[in-house]
Structures are given as C-alpha cells and as structure tokens.
C-alpha cells in the first residue's frame, strides 16, 4: 500500500485546496483583517491604508500564485508539475473555473475600492494600477505556461 501526499487520495493537493469549502470566506476575512490592521496604525491615513492593503495583497498574490513553482508535498525529481506555478496548477490547469474567476476578481475589486477611497489621487492611483496590471496579466489564459523574458523559467 502506498502513501499519497496529503492523505486524502489526491496526488497533487495544490490543484484543489483553493476550491475547498470556506476558503473564499477565510481569504476575504484575512484580507479584511490586514486592512483593519493598517487602519489601526495611528499615523496612517485612510488612503494610505487602502494603498498599503492593495499593494501588499497584490505582492502576496504575485509571489504565492505566480512565482512559486511545484508542489510542496511531492518530490521535485519526479513531479510533472514541478515546472508549473501554483496558478497553473489550480483545478488541474482548467481555465475559467469559479476559483480562478474569484482569484482574478478580488484584485480588481480591491483596486476599485482603493480608487474610491483614495479619490483617484495620482500618488495612489499609479502604483495601485501598476500592481493590478502586474498581478492580473499572468492570470489570463493566454499566459498559461508562458515565461516572459525567461523569468521563472526553471
């Protein structure tokens, strides 16, 4: 009898845990708690708290979904998904699933809320817009498996 990583029968749990029950709620509550943490800092204004929340969220999104490759539970030598980012492994690579749509919509909605609360101030708009573009482009189906400028090729 062989033991499968994760103990629940899936060869690569990386592909399905984001679709698990309660993940979306936990994700949004975590995002809200980070924002409230920024708001609780005495010298941070509301626009800066929104900008910091947006930039931190997008940086974490970019790193955890589009930079890290492979699955932590599998051997790196024999794992066929070792060259895929976490985003490319979600739902076994199937495009436009509800999980992928949710993870694409959250940065966009957060950007729109940030624009609303910063009143489209150029000082806040430019970094927020750049981070939105950087975190949204890799999510498009046309970029599945594409490594721009050979970044993150290996």
Swiss-Prot record:
Glycans are attached at residues 14, 120. The chain crosses the membrane at residues 23-43, 102-118. The gene is ORMDL. InterPro entries: ORMDL. It is a multi-pass membrane protein. Negative regulator of sphingolipid synthesis. Pfam families: ORMDL. One of its GO terms (cellular component) is cytosol. Ubiquitously and homogeneously expressed in the syncytial blastoderm and during the cellularization stage. In stages 11-12, it is expressed in the germ-band layer In later stages (stage 14), it is mainly detected in the ectodermal tissues. In imaginal disks of third-instar larvae, it is uniformly and homogeneously expressed in eye-antenna, leg, wing and haltere imaginal disks, which is consistent with the former ectodermal expression detected in latestage embryos. The keyword RNA-binding does not apply. The keyword Signal does not apply. Belongs to the ORM family. Coiled coil: none annotated. Keywords: Endoplasmic reticulum, Glycoprotein, Membrane, Transmembrane, Transmembrane helix. It is found in: Endoplasmic reticulum membrane. Its main location: endoplasmic reticulum. GO terms for biological process: ceramide metabolic process; intracellular sphingolipid homeostasis; regulation of ceramide biosynthetic process; sphingolipid biosynthetic process. It comes from the Eukaryota. This is ORM1-like protein.
């Amino acid at each position: 009898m062989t033991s499968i990583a994760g103990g629940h029968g899936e060869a690569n749990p990386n592909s399905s845990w984001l679709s698990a029950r309660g993940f979306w709620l936990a994700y949004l509550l975590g995002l809200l708690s980070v924002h409230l943490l920024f708001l609780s800092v005495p010298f941070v204004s509301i626009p800066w708290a929104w900008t910091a929340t947006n930039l931190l969220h997008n940086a974490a999104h970019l790193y955890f979904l589009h930079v890290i490759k492979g699955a932590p539970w599998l051997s790196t030598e024999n794992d066929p998904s070792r060259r895929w980012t976490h985003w490319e492994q979600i739902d076994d690579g199937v495009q436009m699933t509800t999980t992928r749509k949710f993870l694409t919509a959250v940065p966009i909605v957060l950007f729109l809320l940030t624009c609303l609360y910063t009143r489209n101030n150029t000082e806040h708009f430019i970094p927020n817009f750049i981070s939105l573009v950087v975190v949204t482009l890799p999510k498009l189906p046309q970029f599945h498996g594409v490594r721009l400028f050979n970044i993150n090729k290996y």
